[in-house]
Amino acid sequence: MTSERSIDQAPAEAYVWIWLPGKTEPVVAGRIARDGRRMFFNYGQSYLDREDAVPIYEPELPLESGAIPPSAGLSLAGCLRDGAPDAWGRRVILNRVFGRKGKDADIGALDELTCLLESGSDRIGALDFQCSPDKYVSRTAQTATLGELLNAAEKVEAGVPLTPELDQALFHGTSLGGARPKAMIEDEDRKMIAKFSSSTDTYNVVKSEFVAMRLAAKAGLEAAPVRLERVAGKDVLLVERFDRVKVRDGWQRKAMISALTLFGLDEMMARYASYEGLAEAIRHRFTSPKATLHELFGRLVFNILCGNTDDHARNHAGFWDGEHLTLTPAYDICPQRRSGNEASQAMLIVDDKRLSTLANCLEAAPHFQLDAKAAEEHIAEQIGSIRDAWDEVCEEAALTEVERNLFGRRMFLNPFVFEGAPKSLQSLGDAEPA
């Protein structure tokens, strides 16, 4: 394990390296420098002089000289923050670098530059963060089995010190977002995110996400491919990464921008993010806007039908090629357990409404270039698809009878989602998913 040091020794700067479109090696793009609580970015002249230079993200970081401050209300440009770890990665960093374990691991004590520089290099998107503008040193992990990664994740959750081998194995996944235990693995010509169960789970979250992702794909949505593995008697979800492309001389990286960054918000302001606002951004800034709007409407509907209320703005993203945005495949579709029937989405649906109902989807439909008839048909098709594929996907997941009963009608096709919907849709919600 890395020797422990004071958490107050925060770095003053970091250098941003970027994989340009179609390239397999990074180049330095610029520097982040701290100025009080805010962090400014400026492009390096060598990068500005490149004929193939692209803005990290425009309009937030336009390709120009001089220090660029973060947008109002932000301490760091959102497109840079998108590459930082979230709760799980920060727990691993606290364990690894500062020796803080279990309940002593206050992730709020970590500053952003520390998180960027102490997390793994194979982060989501096309950026990495280094201490040097001249020499790129990849922070990668040694090869580890899923069993070893699972063991390491459990130890971090329990606050148990890691051996150097387990510490290095888990380090690779520190740059991933989200709060749940996870790691990254390489599988020949694919890269995968491995998601593990948590000690605080009250139901099989891994299986519920697998079922939702498989049903989303069968419903015609563009969703990241997934598979379920059994390791050391526990379920592990493997999600194929869509921001990596294997070519003859290495890996290309695809830049990604979260919807939170599109909105110019941070986590404290995320409650203002909305599907309505994302639809407007798609109309003006995304490739194939009409088809993309229909896809997003489908994802909204499916999130409600499957009980995924964790559809916050970091769980939507677009590929960025330096000029245009293209919606990424759907990811992190994970049904949430609810105590009562009523539920609300993390993102507003239309106006100030966020209740998880099909009626709200229908009200929002015009923002997705769908009339009432087309929207209702789309919803009916999804309900039919869930019913038709339910048994098959439940068998793929090897769900127990108890799990089927919990997932069906508590998460998937919960009666609450049909309240206020047209009778034709309400009639489709009268039976169990099976």
What residue ranges belong to the model's regions?
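Phosphate/dinucleotide-binding and metal-coordinating scaffold of catalytic cores
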Residues: 1-313, 317-434
